[in-house]
Curated annotation (Swiss-Prot):
Secretion signal, residue range per the UniProt entry: none
Major place of residence: nucleus
Subcellular localization(s) per the UniProt record: Nucleus
Residue numbers spanned by region Disordered: 74-113, 152-172, 393-426
InterPro entries assigned: Ets_dom, ETS_fam, Pointed_dom, SAM/pointed_sf, WH-like_DNA-bd_sf, WH_DNA-bd_sf
Keyword DNA-binding included in the entry's annotation: yes
Domain spans labelled PNT: 258-344
Gene label: Ets98B
Name recorded for this polypeptide: DNA-binding protein D-ETS-4
Protein family according to the UniProt entry: Belongs to the ETS family.
DNA-binding region residue numbers: 430-513
Reported tissue expression: Transient high expression in pole cells during embryonic stages 8-11.
Length: 518
């Protein structure tokens, strides 16, 4: 450019209003021409003609001069590119700055061959290895791309159309993870733990019937063996809770019917009453031997020495006393006796009176109520119509008084004396205080309803007043019986000297007077 300016610069004499400069002045102020050596050797034929375009444009360069189409297998190109290889490939991860001249002013050169063609050429000729010297356009980008194909893991087939990069390779390595996740999902610890937790209750349920069957065999009776029934608490047979009896009402009814049939057959064979309280000592011994033979228990030779009581006293013995006298068969005998008592208590009152009229009733001396002249019957006790004056005679029964006549029904009502006298009215009936002591004599059955607090002093407590009232109403065949009526009868005993209030007044706690506490 400086040279062209010098060619077109006019002479000093031609410039208007320019002072004449001397040669020594020009040399002093003008620097030495740096292009003088180039001007001497410059070939003017290289300058463009007048019809040509401006020399500063780059349109003079044609695309075929840059892109060498037939230089792929030429050895001279390899020789020319060998010295430049160290310069062009110092590092595969560095970028060369753009050229100094404005690159945007020039048209972009033609694109290099496609990556697929370039890869096919490299793999076909060099067996998969890349040679930077044989590249048609040895640029940094091409060298970097080909090196990444060998350094990084291969891309999946669907990504061959894109330029591989470290980021894309990492992305495809992540895509392969779902396959491992699918394989690992075959072993799910949560599902295994859940299955184990579900199987454990089933195992318990599977083993439970075995233990339950063992209990049934240990606590079984003849009726349960025949009908394969589960053992029930004896409380449910004689009242118990209302909901328990409601659920097992059919089973209870069937069991009582079976017990009644067995009792009828044994009573007909032994000529005894169904009420254990009416048995004599000889009848007690006959029933014990029959029960031992029925359940195939060891026979007892001296049975009369072990049990010398009559039926009423036998009914008051506890299970511990039975076991103490007969360790091998005492528990079974006591359980069978309780079943007989329940079967008899479930019968209507008129059947009980008819059965008792055919047998004698023997109460022990401690239960023998002294002679009382009463002008009331048992039903009037429940209705709070007790207006009579009770006169208690000596315990030996030496003095007696004629029985009083009940004006309401025209019959006589007398209480049994210690000498075993019969009661009037065609049959005997149990009194409330006797019934309470009968319940107290069976704590295994009635312990949740009534219990002793101090047996020596005759103090007891009614734990379940509703249940005691129901049992008393069943015994007297009075379905409308409740505890209010029963408590009125108990208060009447205060006037007769049969019961009294305790020293420390407590609710539902009562005390028998002497000799009724014995």
């Amino acid at each position: 450019m400086e040279y062209e300016k010098m060619l077109y610069m006019p002479a000093a004499s031609e410039m208007p209003h320019s002072p004449q400069l001397k040669p020594h002045q020009f040399q002093a102020h003008t620097p030495t021409d740096q292009y003088s050596s180039y001007a001497d050797n410059f070939d003017l034929s290289l300058l463009p003609q007048e019809s040509a375009s401006i020399p500063t444009t780059v349109f003079q360069y044609n695309a075929p001069q840059i892109k060498v189409e037939c230089a792929w297998d030429s050895q001279p190109i390899q020789q020319q590119q060998q010295p430049t290889a160290p310069y062009t490939n110092p590092s595969s991860h560095q970028l060369i700055p753009p050229p100094a001249y404005p690159h945007s002013a020039y048209p972009s050169p033609q694109s290099s061959p496609l990556q697929s063609e370039f890869a096919a050429y490299g793999l076909g000729r060099f067996g998969g290895s890349y040679d930077s010297l044989n590249s048609p356009s040895p640029s940094l980008e091409a060298v970097s791309i080909k090196q990444e194909l060998h350094i990084l893991p291969p891309s999946p087939p669907e990504s061959n159309c894109e330029t591989p990069s470290p980021r894309s390779s990492c992305g495809e390595s992540i895509k392969a993870e779902p396959l491992d996740a699918d394989i690992e999902s075959l072993i799910d610890l949560n599902s295994l733990l859940q299955q184990q937790s579900l199987q454990s209750p089933q195992n318990l349920q599977d083993t439970k019937p075995d233990h339950q069957l063992l209990r049934e065999c240990l606590e079984d009776t003849s009726f349960q063996k025949r009908h394969n029934l589960k053992p029930l608490a004896l409380e449910s047979f004689i009242g118990g809770l209302a909901e328990v009896r409601g659920d097992f009402e059919p089973v209870i009814s069937l069991a009582l019917e079976h017990a009644k049939r067995e009792a009828d057959a044994i009573c007909a064979e032994l000529q005894i009453s169904q009420d254990p309280n009416g048995w004599s000592p000889a009848q007690v011994h006959a029933w014990l031997r029959s029960t031992l033979a029925q359940f195939r228990l060891p026979p007892v030779a001296d049975l009369e020495l072990h049990f010398c009581e009559n039926g009423a006293a036998l009914a008051l013995l506890s299970e511990e006393e039975f076991v103490r006298r007969l360790p091998e068969s005492g528990s079974t005998l006591h359980a069978q006796l309780e079943i007989w008592k329940m079967a008899y208590a479930d019968q209507p009152a008129h059947q009980q009176h008819s059965q008792q009229s055919a047998s004698t009733d023997h109460w022990p001396a401690s239960y023998a109520m002294p002679h009382l002249d009463l002008d009331y019957n048992e039903d009037s006790e429940d209705d709070d119509d007790m207006e009579a004056d009770a006169q208690v005679a000596p315990l030996n029964g030496s003095t007696t008084s004629p029985p009083a006549t009940n004006a309401s029904n025209g019959g006589t009502a007398t209480v049994k004396r210690p000498n075993g006298g019969r009661t009037g009215g065609g049959g005997s009936h149990i009194h409330l205080w006797q019934f309470l002591k009968e319940l107290l004599a069976s704590p295994q059955v009635n312990g949740t309803a009534i219990r002793w607090i101090d047996r020596s002093k005759g103090i007891f407590k009614i734990e379940d007043s509703v249940r005691v009232a129901k049992l008393w109403g069943r015994r007297k065949n009075r379905p409308a019986m409740n505890y209010d009526k029963l408590s009125r009868s108990i208060r009447q005993y205060y006037k007769k000297g049969i019961m009294k209030k305790t020293e420390r007044s407590q609710r539902l706690v009562y005390q028998f007077c002497h000799p009724y506490s014995q």
